[in-house]
Amino acid sequence: MMEGLKKRTRKAFGIRKKEKDTDSTGSPDRDGMQPSPHEPPYHSKAECAREGGKKASKKSNGAPNGFYAEIDWERYNSPELDEEGYSIRPEEPGSTKGKHFYSSSESEEEEESHKKFNIKIKPLQSKDVLKNAATVDELKASIGNIALSPSPVRKSPRRSPGAIKRNLSSEEVARPRRSTPTPELTSKKPLDDTLALAPLFGPPLESAFDEQKTEVLLDQPEIWGSGQPMNPSTESPELARPFPTGTPPPLPPKTVPATPPRTGSPLTVATGNDQAATEAKIEKLPSISDLDSIFGPVLSPKSVAVNTEEKWVHFSDASPEHVTPELTPREQVVTPPAASDIPADSPAPAPPGPTGSAGPPGPPGPRHVPSPLNLEEVQKKVAEQTFIKDDYLETLSSPKECGLGQRATPPPPPPPTYRTVVSSPGPGSGSGTGTTSGASSPARPATPLVPCSTTPPPPPPRPPSRPKLPPGKPGVGDVSRPFSPPIHSSSPPPIAPLARAESTSSISSTNSLSAATTPTVGSSRGPSPLTMGAQDTLPVAAAFTETVNAYFKGADPSKCIVKITGEMVLSFPAGITRHFANNPSPAALTFRVVNSSRLEHVLPNPQLLCCDNTQNDANTKEFWVNMPNLMTHLKKVSEQKPQATYYNVDMLKYQVSAQGIQSTPLNLAVNWRCEPASTDLRIDYKYNTDAMSTAVALNNVQFLVPIDGGVTKLQAVLPPAVWNAEQQRILWKIPDISQKSENGGVGSLLARFQLSEGPSKPSPLVVQFTSEGSTLSGCDIELVGAGYRFSLIKKRFAAGKYLADN
């Protein structure tokens, strides 16, 4: 309780009365604080705290002497002062107890009658409220003195006690000082104030995390799906969100173990992941069955062998007779709407055998359709032999073409067979336009069975929405050529059932090991990114993917056997179907393949492509798309996959002429020295820039060699490698090999194995690698005419069956 607050001019600190009892007064500058005449004596701290409920150690007001304006009561709550500025214990009016803190009694009595007035200040606290049954307003006034962190929710203003002036009467001081009441505090006690504020500080953070978790749950498949190369084949609707947790979805098992090398140490058993990964890798490598005639029998008995036949067609060759085989159950299966769409630059698991990799042309006749493949074997092969994937949305970055968040969940494991998922029925058994082959796209015939008419009908008239051709560019009708292959009147227009147009990935190498190391971007569950007007050009993406198969025998370059196959895929945005619906007569899509002199066999899609066999330029081949068939096919796919974003369409398959070892991007030579107690292995490799149209690095290079003879210990392994004791295989991994590598991409791998059941028998070395940004054939593509534009042209190649023997 504070009373008798005096209103007087304070004297200078240094002036003191000589008769003052220095033993009974507190030091003004005690506790190391700045000297202040407003500090109460040390021995009065407990009493002041008990009476006023404030801190015993008062803070200086900081105002000069003679300042009578508003006082910051948070810093200064002074009892009465004497002439020299020393604190005096406040007394009740008329009190005779003499509690004057030993200050000058003469000075007090002189000024008390005419200078001193009484102010009754009662800072209300919890005990006072409970004892005196204080009103709500008094409770607010007392709580207002408590310094709390500002509430993030409640915005009630808090009036500072400093607004109380020293010349106010006790009536005015007792009146509540808040200008705005706080209804939230009316039912709370001061003791519960902290609890009442708990929801203001805690739950908002929790709710924010809850909202964030909810958002992550919804968006994470889109976030992690953009970089997640799961087993690419299909995407079932029930597995659209396979990873609902806050952690990123796990990558599929990589093809090589990641354990540290075990060189110079006793033989130990590798971990389960290493064993499974290495086993999967060695099983899938020798899986191109149609190359058995070149590379010999398949090395692994567990590999999937598919007998396929192919008919490579020269442009100069006459079209074979129409063959109308019976549709097998494989062909009759309609593509289920369970696959997500990946752009053209994203690869897909090709059917067994490299795309378009087949023997020389054979006589026309009925074809043998392979029976369905074993489920377990195909799942393993397709899941682990897909080629590296890339993104397509990066190219559709304009606001017209692409929206944010166009990402999708990683696809689930593949179906029983690739064909049963991606196949769709042909135009009709009587049309004579459909057959199948294991090495070509399962959704279309292996060979063009419908000849291009030599007397073509004129192209359709230019639609009013199509912009005029720029000067110097030939129109579609400038050259006499058919717009589409002739269609028998007894059959409906072909649907062009190109399977991988709606599969999760459409560019593949059947023997690549890099699917687990490269993210996939581009699939989406959202709407089509294509938003365009009638005068805009349609974005189209193209991708060349080539597979090199090679067999090296010892160090003799003349014994190297090489085969290179490739495919070209076009990718269309899903919104193109709406554009075609609004423009039923779109511009014909015409393109030419340039630098095609090295292409020995070119197999265009007979359902969608027309070619001019009379072209004289051997370095250029021109094609144009059967637009009615393309529109029909894309419409069908859009109905089956309304959430798809991209439609990938196989357009060309081809074979590249090879010049032996000079056509291999990585030359190999293996040397074995087998003894009863040990085996020495040396692998020499050389990066060959001459094999590529543009020198690019070989990525994720892996060397895998099985070693028999009961290996008990590894010695002198350079560089470090991973040994799988259960499968008796050693694996080297090199991130990349290029001209910038050590020694210009030339190096050796060395290893010595201690044997218990020697000698070892030399086994073939299996090599895998991928490369982006170049092709081995040097082919390129360019558009002819207007109405379309290339948003992306992707080029890549990878090792297929890449072997080296002693």
UniProtKB/Swiss-Prot annotation:
InterPro entries: AP2_Mu_C_sf, MHD, Muniscin_C, SGIP1_MHD. Keywords: Coated pit, Endocytosis, Membrane, Phosphoprotein. Residues 245-260, 346-369, 454-473 have a biased composition (Pro residues). Residues 1-115, 142-278, 315-533 are annotated as: Disordered. It is found in: Membrane, Clathrin-coated pit. It holds the Pfam family muHD. The keyword Transport does not apply. This is SH3-containing GRB2-like protein 3-interacting protein 1. It comes from Mus musculus.
